[in-house]
């Protein structure tokens, strides 16, 4: 007879995922064992194995759950307004707000997704691409001059860089609130994007490709 599922099964699973994310962020995925996770969660190894067969399954669930929440929140934010500038700010604000209390999950996403087998990486990378596509579309709508791929991709990833690494310096109660930082990033991007795109356009075609001999030197 199959073992019945406890009423608090989902709550315990979420706790295991969050605590495991903290442990992975602190000690690294490779340096964290199932024993460490069980001790960190204050549960027996037997109970931990009732939820997950190995730490690879835990890592996948941490990332899948984290990215699903981000995608759902950003998709909702993307539909809240048709004003291009407001739409961009709303998306940036939503991302920063979703990162609240999820620093560990976010660090694990950056550092450990690549440690999963390729077949398990694919659905997670697909979720990441959804986020990238939504932000890129919002940037292009807010500043049409950056819509060319040569400019849009670097700009999109630059914005993600400002948001994804904020946990290294941002402190609640510090110089800026999350809302203020979201406004700061939005204004910075809107003010500088057009000039940056124009500079790239002016330089486009001016640089000659390296000779074959020089290419060999560079390689």
Set out the residue ranges of the language-model regions.
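Short coil/turn segments at alpha/beta junctions that flank glycine-rich nucleotide-binding fingerprints
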Residues: 26-30, 80-81, 102, 145
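Helix-turn-helix
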Residues: 2, 15, 19, 23-57, ...
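Short, hydrophobic secondary-structure boundary micro-motifs
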Residues: 107-111, 148, 171, 200-202
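C-terminal peripheral helix-coil segments that are non-catalytic and often amphipathic
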Residues: 1, 97, 101, 132-141, ...
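Amphipathic alpha-helical segments used for helix-helix packing
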Residues: 87, 100-119, 168-169
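Amphipathic alpha-helical packing segments from all-alpha helical-bundle domains
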Residues: 68-71, 118-144, 153-157, 180-183
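Hydrophobic alpha-helical connector segments
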Residues: 61, 75-101, 155-156
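Generic hydrophobic, amphipathic alpha-helix propensity
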Residues: 12-20, 37, 62-74, 135
